[in-house]
Every structure is written in structure tokens, then in C-alpha cells.
Regions:
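Conserved NB-ARC/NACHT P-loop NTPase core of NLR-like innate immune receptors
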Residues: 2-458
Length: 458
């Protein structure tokens, strides 16, 4: 199942408080307990969580213009617009950019907190613990503290503790109250302590894939809450990424303090995107050559690279899926690449994009030996695929293989065999590890009967 959030403090029945005192309603504190431990946290939603340690960052010298735009905005004293909206179609690399800038701001000693929404990932798709998670991260980040800012960080912690003592039920109250009491007031104290310190230190909140929040009212409410007022005294910068969905776009359109007009990844010149994609592919192809003898130094060649760049259609997720597909069986990388190159995207023939072609190629290759099976074995293999992949897509939760086995009554061996065949589009590292999709576009592909018809028909 999804990772259980760390509530730090349990709401207890009066009969089970073991001497704890009751403060304001039904929230109990044990004497000597740090109020910060009361804050519910979705650990896996943070950019530096264990679950995200293998997620990619931008390759050096790629997406440089977009990153520089963000960094320049963050350190500009003359720009009081505190929110930066980075939009782009699915697969354009928004989450990778968000992870990269979060790590870079942390390296620059900014106070960084992040929340990466993820559809189908339990607490990570809900906004219920967004502000409490961000507040806890701001209060407990120790790797960014310097001698000049340590007293300011202590002031932030003290302000947050005091807010929780004064109103322990704030974690159950409106998002506006949580925002004001858990984020803005502590950050205002943080900034006040820095007034006499010569530093450009600021707090940076990174909220990725807001459109993947499961509740549309929460999406609107989050934007309205954060954009309601100018925040010059909080030294706060907020980066939000999302697809350019109508709901999100309309919420941003009438907020003058939101910097977003020229920050769509879809507006980046094609030659810039292609240059970044070429660097990405060159780097990954170099690694493949290192693991497979017999490939020439210029493999796969400039002509092939240009074909692949056209197939990418500006989507980094296509390039990532292609490389994972080639890397999962390095001894057959060349033949797999030829299979991809020989496939022609057909408009209106059951799928419509090169990315669909890539997903179809992965599925067809995963089950290409079905022709050698008996009819009953073929039917069983297809049923296993339908039940395993269908459950992962429909249940929309980070299930482990053991939990999925319990729910579907399919053996762990069969589940792991299916997942192993699909490891270029489904991430899974062990029986008890969460199963996650490489990208939300694969869920959308599998869920669209028209787009997957070519595979099912074959």
C-alpha cells in the first residue's frame, strides 16, 4: 500500500493519554514532547525522499535556459512576484526540472521544502497534508543552515512551535489558516532575523504536478490561498509546475503577482529542446555502448539520432522510455532500436503519437513469445497482464507486489514476472517495494481503449 505518513503524534482517547494534558479540544500533548512532531508529513512527496533518490535530474547543460530563468527570478530583489508557474504538456520534463531546481536551491543554502503530487500514490495525490508537510520540512532542514542563518532558522522553529501550542487543532483547520500560521508567520520571523544579515537567503517552496492533485477544489484553493497576497516580508519564492489544464490556467490568469506568461515549456524554441534531447540521448547511448561489445563508436549514427529526435516530438518521456527499453537488455539494444525505427506512427490506426508507438513496442516485446504457447497458456498470460497492470492503473495506489498478490489472488511469482517484462515503463525493486509507473502518460495510454487497441488486436 502507499507509504504511511508519519503523523508524529497520535490523537488519543482520553483514557489512553497516560498523563498527557489536553489542550484546546481533543489534541493531547505529552509533557516534554516537541510540538513539531504533531505535524503529519507525507515523506515520499519530498524531492529528496528515499522514494525519489533514483528519479532523474536534468543532465548537465540541458534545460539551461528554463533553469536560469527560475534562478534569476528567485534572486531578483526587484521582482516581488513570489509565485513562478512552470507549465507544459505531459512528458515535457516538468518534474525533472522541479527536482533539479529543488536540489540546486538546497545546494545554494536556501531553505527548501517541496511536495511532488503523484496521481495514484495515496497521500501524495491528496492536498490534505500539503501545508503540514511543507511546514515540517522548513522547520527541520538542517543541511542548509549557516552560521549567519542559524538564529533565523531557530526563530522559524520557535514560531511554528508556538503556533501549534496556541492552536493545536490548526492541522485540522482551513488551508488559509494552515498557510498563515504554519508557513507565513514562521517565515516572517525567519526573515526578520535576517534583516541585519548580509545574505540573499530565502525560502523556496517547490510544488510539482499540481494538476495531479485528486481534488479539483483543492487545486483551486491552493492557488487562491498562495496568490491572495504579496509576501515581501517572508522572503518566500514558490515554484509550481503543472500541465496547462484549463482549471489551473484560469486560476492563474487573473492573479497579477504570478509570473507565468513566458514560462510554458511548450513555448521553448524547438531547436533548443532538440539540442537538449540530443545531449540526453548521446549520454545514454554512450552508456549503452560501454556495456555492449561490438557497437561502433558512432552508434547509432547521426541519421538515426535525427530520426529519434523527430520521434520524440519534444517529449523527454519518449527519450527516457526509449533508453530504458534499450538498457534493460543491452545485448539486444541494437535489434531493439531497429524495431523502434521500423515502426511507423499511424494516425487514426488505434494510436496517434510516437509515444504511443513506444509504449506499444514495449508491450509487444514483453509478450512477443506468446505465439509459442498453447491457446490456454496465451489466455492465461493475457489474463495475468490484464489483472496485474489493470489493478496498478485502476487502484491508483503505490501497491507492493505482496499486497497486489493478496488483493488479486495472483501469485507473487507471476506478478514479479509480469513486472520484470515491463520494467521500462513500471518501476519496482522488490516484493515489498511500491510499484510505480514511469510516467502518468503510461496510465493514460493503458486506460484509453482506442490507443491500446493495436496491442490487444495483435
Amino acid at each position: 500500500m502507499a507509504h504511511l505518513r508519519d503523523t508524529g503524534h497520535n490523537y488519543q482517547r482520553p483514557s489512553a493519554t497516560n498523563g498527557a494534558s489536553q489542550i484546546n479540544g481533543d489534541v493531547f500533548f505529552t509533557p516534554g514532547q516537541d510540538p513539531l512532531n504533531q505535524l503529519p508529513v507525507v515523506h515520499e512527496a519530498s524531492h529528496d525522499s528515499a522514494e525519489k533518490q533514483d528519479d532523474p535530474l536534468c543532465l548537465e547543460n540541458t534545460r539551461a535556459q528554463v533553469q536560469e530563468c527560475i534562478y534569476s527570478w528567485q534572486k531578483s530583489d526587484g521582482d516581488d512576484r513570489c509565485i513562478f508557474w512552470l507549465s507544459g504538456m505531459a512528458g515535457t520534463g516538468k518534474s525533472t526540472i522541479a527536482r533539479t531546481v529543488a536540489h540546486e536551491f538546497q545546494r545554494r543554502k536556501c531553505l527548501v521544502a517541496s511536495f511532488f503530487f503523484s496521481r495514484g500514490s495515496g497521500d501524495s495525490e491528496s492536498a490534505s497534508f500539503l501545508f503540514t508537510s511543507l511546514a515540517k520540512q522548513l522547520a527541520t532542514r538542517r543541511d542548509t543552515a549557516t552560521q549567519a542563518t542559524s538564529s533565523a532558522h531557530i526563530a522559524l522553529q520557535d514560531a511554528l512551535r508556538e503556533a501549534l501550542r496556541q492552536d493545536p487543532d490548526v492541522i485540522r483547520k482551513s488551508r488559509q489558516e494552515q498557510w498563515d500560521k504554519l508557513i507565513i508567520r514562521p517565515l516572517t520571523c525567519f526573515s526578520a532575523k535576517l534583516q541585519d544579515v548580509s545574505t540573499t537567503t530565502s525560502a523556496v517552496l517547490v510544488i510539482d504536478a499540481l494538476d495531479e492533485c485528486s481534488n479539483e477544489n483543492d487545486i483551486k484553493g491552493i492557488i487562491r490561498t498562495m496568490a491572495r497576497q504579496q509576501l515581501p516580508h517572508a522572503r518566500l519564492r514558490i515554484i509550481i509546475t503543472s500541465r496547462p489544464e484549463t482549471l489551473v490556467r484560469l486560476e492563474f490568469s487573473d492573479k497579477r503577482n504570478i509570473l507565468h506568461s513566458s514560462l510554458s515549456l511548450d513555448d521553448v524554441p524547438q531547436h533548443v529542446i532538440d539540442a537538449d534531447l540530443a545531449r540526453f540521448l548521446h549520454s545514454r547511448f554512450d552508456a549503452i555502448r560501454d556495456h555492449q561489445e561490438g557497437l561502433t563508436q558512432d552508434w547509432p549514427g547521426l541519421h538515426t539520432l535525427n530520426i529519434l529526435l523527430r520521434r520524440c516530438e519534444g517529449l523527454f518521456i519518449y527519450a527516457e522510455t526509449l533508453c530504458l527499453y534499450l538498457e534493460e537488455d543491452c545485448q539486444h539494444s541494437h535489434s531493439r532500436l531497429q524495431t523502434v525505427l521500423n515502426k511507423t506512427t499511424l494516425q487514426g490506426k488505434g494510436h496517434t503519437t510516437a509515444l504511443d508507438d513506444m509504449y506499444l513496442t514495449v508491450l509487444i516485446n514483453a509478450f512477443k513469445n506468446l505465439s509459442k504457447l498453447s491457446e490456454s497458456e496465451k489466455d492465461r498470460s493475457k489474463d495475468l497482464y490484464d489483472h496485474v497492470v489493470g489493478s496498478i492503473v485502476v487502484l491508483q495506489d503505490d501497491l507492493s507486489a505482496s499486497t497486489l498478490s493478496y488483493l488479486t489472488q495472483i501469485s507473487q511469482f507471476d506478478i514479479m514476472a509480469i513486472l520484470h517484462r515491463l520494467r521500462s515503463v513500471i518501476k519496482q525493486s522488490g516484493i515489498e517495494s511500491p510499484i510505480t509507473l514511469l510516467h502518468e502518460t503510461f496510465r493514460e495510454f493503458v486506460s484509453d481503449q482506442r490507443r491500446r487497441k493495436s496491442y490487444e488486436g495483435g
